[in-house]
């Protein structure tokens, strides 16, 4: 449910936001409460977002032993529902404030198996602590610019399944080529009307690793 109580925030400057009245706004998704600030990025269409999270969980077929990597994780929209089912979830996000919010949301929901890191995913991440870990499945939900900077690392990690959520068909098509060329097949494709009465759609794709493809020589 979306908290609909009266809330009042004042912005004395572009860098400040004072919480004057009411609770912190929140979404309830899959028995997880996600609190956020009016300045945070969050999916505006709660009902479609809930369905999108449910579909991602189903497509990834999360098992109790799975370790899951959530790239461009924001405040934990996918990470925390995934952590309800997986052994461990690592979320990576470029904005410090969102990493702090995701960490606080994990603690508030009693999810000690979700860990969050700040990183610029347009740069080489291979030497970062979280990038040295192994993951069974990966979800990514980048901005319109896509995820070109991290696609090679996703391939190197060799997860069994990848769910890519996109708001830009052009960058989704570009980034998908890396997966298709490295032994993944497109197993599912869905469209979600996140923004009714506009020309914008949210896409979700599931890629599944096949066994007959020889690994790329860059794989570590």
Swiss-Prot record:
Catalytic activity, reaction form: uridine(1939) in 23S rRNA + S-adenosyl-L-methionine = 5-methyluridine(1939) in 23S rRNA + S-adenosyl-L-homocysteine + H(+)
InterPro entries given in the database record: MeTrfase_TrmA_AS (IPR030390), MeTrfase_TrmA_CS (IPR030391), SAM-dependent_MTases_sf (IPR029063), U5_MeTrfase_fam (IPR010280)
GO molecular function, one term: rRNA (uridine-C5-)-methyltransferase activity
Entry's EC annotation: 2.1.1.190
SUPFAM superfamilies: S-adenosyl-L-methionine-dependent methyltransferases (SSF53335)
Enzyme class, broadest EC rank: transferase
Keywords noted in UniProt: Methyltransferase, rRNA processing, S-adenosyl-L-methionine, Transferase
Annotated S-adenosyl-L-methionine binding sites: 43, 72, 77, 93, 120, 141
GO biological process, alphabetically ordered: rRNA base methylation
Keyword match Transferase: yes
Top-level taxon in the UniProt lineage: Bacteria
Pfam family, one: tRNA_U5-meth_tr
Active site: 167 (nucleophile)
Protein task: Catalyzes the formation of 5-methyl-uridine at position 1939 (m5U1939) in 23S rRNA.
Family: Belongs to the class I-like SAM-binding methyltransferase superfamily. RNA M5U methyltransferase family. RlmD subfamily.
PANTHER family (UniProt xref): 23S RRNA (URACIL(1939)-C(5))-METHYLTRANSFERASE RLMD (PTHR11061:SF49), RNA M5U METHYLTRANSFERASE (PTHR11061)
Name listed for the protein in its UniProt record: 23S rRNA (uracil(1939)-C(5))-methyltransferase RlmD
């Amino acid at each position: 449910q979306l908290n609909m109580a009266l809330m009042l925030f004042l912005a004395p400057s572009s860098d400040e936001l004072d919480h004057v009245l009411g609770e912190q706004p929140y979404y309830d998704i899959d028995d997880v409460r996600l609190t956020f600030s009016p300045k945070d990025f969050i999916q505006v269409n709660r009902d479609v977002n809930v369905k999108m999270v449910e579909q991602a969980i189903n497509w990834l077929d999360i098992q109790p032993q799975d370790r899951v990597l959530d790239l461009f994780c924001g405040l934990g929209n996918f990470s925390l529902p995934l952590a309800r089912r997986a052994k461990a979830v690592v979320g990576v996000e470029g904005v410090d404030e969102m990493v702090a919010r995701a960490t606080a949301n994990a603690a508030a929901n009693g999810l000690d198996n979700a860990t969050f890191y700040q990183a610029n995913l347009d740069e080489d991440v291979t030497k970062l602590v979280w990038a040295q870990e192994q993951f069974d499945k990966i979800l990514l939900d980048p901005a319109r610019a896509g995820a070109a900077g991290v696609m090679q690392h996703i391939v190197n990690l060799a997860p069994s399944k990848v769910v890519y959520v996109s708001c830009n068909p052009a960058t989704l098509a570009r980034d998908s080529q890396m997966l298709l060329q490295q032994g993944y097949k497109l197993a599912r494709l869905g469209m979600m009307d996140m923004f009714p009465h506009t020309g914008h759609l949210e896409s979700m794709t599931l890629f599944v690793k096949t066994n007959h493809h020889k690994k790329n020589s860059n794989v570590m």
